[in-house]
A protein has these predicted regions:
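N-terminal Rossmann NAD(P)H-binding glycine-rich loop of SDR-like oxidoreductase domains
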Residues: 3-23
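Substrate-positioning beta->alpha
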Residues: 147-148, 176-181, 194-217, 224-228
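Mid/C-terminal beta-alpha module of Rossmann-like enzyme folds, strongest
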Residues: 215-280, 297, 317-318
Length: 326
């Protein structure tokens, strides 16, 4: 089977490409002209140069391909709204259209649990939970991922394109900073986290996520499938930091979230004035971050028979020292 990976030079896409190469799967990657891909080419990866917004380049990338992993996205916080929508929404639309034209057997699209809105504290969020009703109150990344997810669902239903949408949480692993919390910072070995230590923490170790992506690629049937995925539904901030402390001897202090919420209107006003691009902090955004959000993953565990192979402590151990914490 010939496979194409968009975003194959990024964190998740790069890890996926390495996995496929280890499995001796022929891989093609769509890479931006500005990104170095010498190492991939030296390992036998076919590299197609082009932007997601270039229909000709995308068509070349998926021509003759059976399976496409669409992982490419603009994920950083800086930038204008148009930049996020060009890559994450119009880019996704272009990839799906090209895959339909090329007769691709299946597309696995990497979305995000960021598409969901406010819920009652502790309420289970599954694949039937509505999208966020107030996307304009979110940062540009979240707005664009929500719009792209909606577009992908609509496209698959209208055209019959065999599509699997994966909605992971916070992805980490070797080469990427270990997460601390949705509202957090660190100074040396000391971590400072705002919010209750009992809040659920939706994490995905990169290799566990790739296991699920490969299972999704081999699903029977052509119908649209949607999967929420986090490694441990029951993981809390307290248990995560306790486990992390056992590995790296770090110390974590928790602070109440209400002062952050109280300051949100002022901070958002300041950020609207300052030239900080896509960085936004709104009351709505902070309320989501301080809610206890339980992501229900029964569907992916039952239908794909997926379970994380790398446990939390081992995943932290593998990630320690590969990147500065953030």
């Amino acid at each position: 089977m010939r496979v194409c990976v968009t975003g194959g030079t990024g964190f998740l896409g790069g890890a996926l490409v390495r996995r496929l190469l280890a499995e001796r799967v022929p891989v093609r990657v769509l890479a931006r002209p500005s990104v170095r891909a010498d190492e991939l080419e030296s390992r036998g990866v076919e590299v197609v140069r082009g932007e997601l917004g270039d229909p000709a380049a995308v068509a070349r990338a998926v021509r003759g391909i059976e399976l496409v992993y669409h992982v490419a996205a603009k994920v950083d916080s800086a930038g204008k709204a148009a930049e996020f929508f060009e890559t994450n929404v119009r880019g996704t639309e272009g990839v799906l259209a090209a895959c339909l034209d090329a007769g691709v057997r299946r597309v696995v699209y990497e979305s995000s649990i960021a598409v969901y809105g406010l819920v009652r504290n502790g309420e289970h969020i599954d694949e039937n939970t509505p999208y966020d009703e107030f996307p304009k109150l979110r940062d540009f990344y979240s707005q664009s991922k929500l719009a792209a997810d909606q577009l992908a669902v609509s496209f698959a239903r209208k055209t019959g394109l065999p599509l699997v949408i994966m909605r992971p949480g916070i992805i980490y692993g070797p080469g990427k900073a270990l997460p601390l919390g949705l509202l957090s910072f660190n100074l040396g070995k000391s971590n400072f986290v705002f919010g209750s230590p009992d809040l659920h923490f939706p994490l995905n170790y990169v290799e566990n996520l790739i296991d699920a992506m490969e299972l999704a690629a081999n699903l029977d049937g052509d119908q649209l499938r949607e999967f929420n995925i986090v490694d441990d539904e029951d993981l809390t901030l307290l248990r995560y930091h306790s486990t992390k402390s056992n590995v790296d001897q770090s110390r974590t202090r928790f602070f109440p979230g209400w002062p952050v919420l109280a300051a949100a209107p002022l901070v958002d006003t300041v950020m609207r004035v300052l030239p900080l691009g896509g960085t936004r902090i709104t009351k709505h955004q902070l309320e989501r971050s301080l809610q206890d959000r339980f992501y229900d993953t029964r569907r992916i565990r039952q239908e794909l028979r997926w379970a994380p192979k790398v446990p939390l402590e081992e995943s932290i151990r593998r990630s320690i020292g590969t990147h500065d914490h953030a």
